[in-house]
From Swiss-Prot:
The keyword Ribonucleoprotein does not apply. The gene is ECO1. Keywords: Acyltransferase, Cell cycle, Metal-binding, Nucleus, Transferase, Zinc, Zinc-finger. This is N-acetyltransferase ECO1. One of its GO terms (cellular component) is chromatin. It is found in: Nucleus.
Length: 288
């Protein structure tokens, strides 16, 4: 029986029962929850939370502090997370991206002509021994997982692995902000991990092992402002070149983990193959 790929690639704990059990003793939890006291308000919706349709953050719009937190998170989500110059010590490639922006003249309803600005773009890896860099990558991944509605990754990019292929975190930086990320994971057990999915249905192909995969793409993400510039595809090409010292990986040696709809389109264009049935297959792997 076919199952959804997200169930197979990113299993989650089943939800606990919502039934009230008066005999059950309350348990302690270390999870921090923001609490807002519900005082009477002239606004009928004052006690209701708001979820931003763009960044996905849930907050209380009538609370000034919540608004400030949301505004900061929203800006970083759209434009990228701050990335200090001191973190840019392992730059792999530099290139130019032409940023097309439109503005509106003050006092008029007419839009200005598109203005193009050349932006130097850096792609780098992090120093895993630098705790501040590791922490910043973890912050970025929280944003990524939040948008993808994905569980936390296996942190393979932080670990040392046997063999020539290591997990890495590749960062794309423009104007001092991390606007893209790709984390990778070396395959440990081909038979247990490597599969194919049907792009149209996202169902696993039964009883098939993809023995070509050597490196998994755990997460790949570009900040919304910088999408449709071809950066995700370019980032994958850089991963091929810089994942194994002295060797350029082939596209068929790359597998994807839990691809979202947009991620599935990226994977399809990058290394999808057409089966004799006419279905397009995407190489995937199961995260350990």
């Amino acid at each position: 029986m076919k199952r959804d790929i997200t169930q197979l690639l990113s299993p989650e704990l089943s939800q606990s029962s919502s039934r009230n059990d008066k005999k059950r003793k309350p348990t302690n939890s270390n999870k921090k929850v923001q609490t807002v006291l519900n005082f009477p308000s002239s606004s009928p919706n004052a006690s209701q939370s708001t979820t931003c349709p763009t960044c996905g953050m849930t907050y209380y719009s009538h609370v000034s502090k919540d608004n400030d937190v949301h505004n900061k998170y929203h800006f970083n989500f759209i434009n990228g997370i701050p990335w200090p110059t001191s973190f840019c010590n392992n730059v792999l490639e530099r290139f130019i991206v032409v940023d097309h922006t439109t503005g509106k003249a003050k006092g008029t309803s007419k839009s200005k002509k598109s203005q193009a600005a050349s932006k130097e773009t850096l792609v780098m890896t992090i120093d895993r021994r630098a705790s501040k860099q590791v922490k910043r990558v973890e912050e970025i991944l929280k944003v990524v997982n939040g948008e993808l509605n994905a569980a936390s990754d296996g942190k393979a990019w932080q670990k040392d692995h046997k063999g020539p292929i290591q997990g890495r975190a590749f960062i794309v930086v423009i104007d001092g902000r991390a606007i893209g990320i790709c984390t990778t994971e070396p395959i440990q057990d081909v038979d247990q991990q490597c599969r194919w999915i049907i792009h149209r249905t996202q169902a696993l192909v039964p009883n098939q092992v993809n023995r070509s995969i050597k490196l998994g793409i755990s997460r790949i993400w570009i900040a919304p402002k910088w999408r449709r510039y071809g950066l995700a595809r370019r980032l994958l090409d850089i991963v091929l070149v810089h994942s194994v010292y002295g060797i350029v990986l082939d596209k068929k040696e790359i597998g994807f983990s839990q691809p979202s709809f947009s991620g599935g389109l990226l994977a399809k264009s990058f290394n999808g193959v057409t089966h004799k049935s006419g279905e397009i297959l995407i190489p995937v792997y199961l995260e350990e």
